[in-house]
Amino acid sequence: MRVTKRDLKHNREGEISLTPETLDDLWHLKYIIEKGDLVFSLTKRKADNAADKLRPEKAEKKTVRLGVRVEDVEFHKFSNRLRVHGLIEHGMDAGFYHTLNIEDGTNLSITKYWKKDQLERVNEAEAASKRPKVILVAIEEGDADIGFVRHYGIEIYSHITQSSGKGEGTLREVFFSTILDQLTHAMSGTESVVVSGPGFTKDDFMKYASSKNSDLVAGILVEDTSSIGMSGFQEVLRRGAVDRIMEESRIARESSLMDSLLKEIALDGKVAYGMDEVKQAIDFGAVETLLVADEMLRLERESGNIDGLIQNVERSQGKMVVFSTEFEPGQRLHSLGGIAAILRFKV
C-alpha cells in the first residue's frame, strides 16, 4: 500500500490518501473502511442530462471523482475488487447512491475518525509493500503444492501431480521440471522461497533445480515437514521458517499467539476466551494481549460495543492483535467465540 497523504488531527480525525497495490491491501481496506466514512475516488457514472433521459440507452459513462458516504463494504477476493457502496455527497448526482469499485492501483482518500488499530493496519500494509513476499513449495513423492503467503492467509497457487506409467526416472524429471516451471512463473523476482516436505524428495528437487537455475536456488530455504498441502504450509509457519524471512509476518505472529493461547487453555492458565470472560479480565486490568477475529471486530464495531473494551486494554498497557478468519489461527479463534486474551495473571 502506498500512502500519499496524511492529514490527521490530534484526536485521529482526518484524511488519509492511499493506493492499494495488492490483494492484501484490499483485504486491509475491508477492515479500515466502515459505515459513515467519506471515501473519494475516481469512478465511472452515467451523465444525468436531458438528452440522456430521453435516450437512456445512449447515455455514456463518464470518469468523475465522487465522494461517497459509506453504507456497505464488500471484499470480492476472486475478482480482486473491493466494492464501497453509499450515498454521493460530493460530485455529480449528489443524493443518489453509487458503488465505488476499488482495485489495486486505485487512488482513494478516506476521511473519518481513525481508530488506533486501523492506523496500525495502514502502517503495516505500507511497510509490507517494502518487504519481500514469500512463496511456499511443499513436495513429496509424486505430489507438490505451491502457495503464496498473504496477509489474509495462505493462497494455493497450484497443485502438481506426477504422471504414472513406465519410465519412472523420466517421469520424475518431468515432475520436477513442472514444479520448477510453475515456481519460476509465480515469481516476479523479489520473493523469498521456502521448499519443504517429508523425506528426500525436496532435496532431490533442489539438486535438479540447481542444475537448471542455480541463481534461483541460491536463495531458497529448505525445511523438513511431515506433510505437504495446507497442513505442510502451516507446519512451515509454526517452525518459524517464514518468520526468519519476514520477521514481522502477520501469519507467523498469529500462529505463535494461537499456540500460546491453546497451551494456556490446556493448562487452565492465564487465559480468557469468549466475550464474558474477556470483559471480566479487562475489568481486572489483567489483559496482556487481546486477540480478536476480524469478523468479530467488524460486527461488534457496527453495534458500537467493542471500542470501549479496546481502549480499556490500551489504558492498562495491553495490546491488541486482529486475526484473519481466512487463516487457520483466526478460524480457531472464531470457534472460541471470536475473542480471547492472554493474561498477566489468572482471573
Swiss-Prot record:
Species in which this protein is naturally found: Methanococcoides burtonii (strain DSM 6242 / NBRC 107633 / OCM 468 / ACE-M)
A cellular-component GO term for this protein: cytoplasm
MF term (GO), any: endonuclease activity
Keywords, comma-separated and alphabetical: Cytoplasm, Endonuclease, Hydrolase, Metal-binding, Nuclease
Keyword presence, Transferase: no
Function description: May function in recognizing stalled ribosomes, interact with stem-loop structures in stalled mRNA molecules, and effect endonucleolytic cleavage of the mRNA. May play a role in the release non-functional ribosomes and degradation of damaged mRNAs. Has endoribonuclease activity.
Domain notes: The N-terminal domain has the RNA-binding Sm fold. It harbors the endoribonuclease activity.
Enzyme class: hydrolase
UniProt cross-references to SUPFAM superfamilies, sorted A to Z: Dom34/Pelota N-terminal domain-like (SSF159065), L30e-like (SSF55315), Translational machinery components (SSF53137)
Cofactor list: a divalent metal cation
InterPro entries listed in its UniProt record: eFR1_2_sf, eRF1_1_Pelota, eRF1_2, eRF1_3, Pelota/DOM34_N, Pelota_arc, Ribosomal_eL30-like_sf, Transl-rel_pelota
Entry protein name: Protein pelota homolog
Subunit structure: Monomer.
HAMAP family the UniProt entry points to: PelO
Encoding gene, per UniProt annotation: pelA
PANTHER family: PELOTA, PROTEIN PELOTA HOMOLOG
Similarity section: Belongs to the eukaryotic release factor 1 family. Pelota subfamily.
E.C. designation(s): 3.1.-.-
A Pfam family this chain is assigned to: eRF1_2
Subcellular location, record wording: Cytoplasm
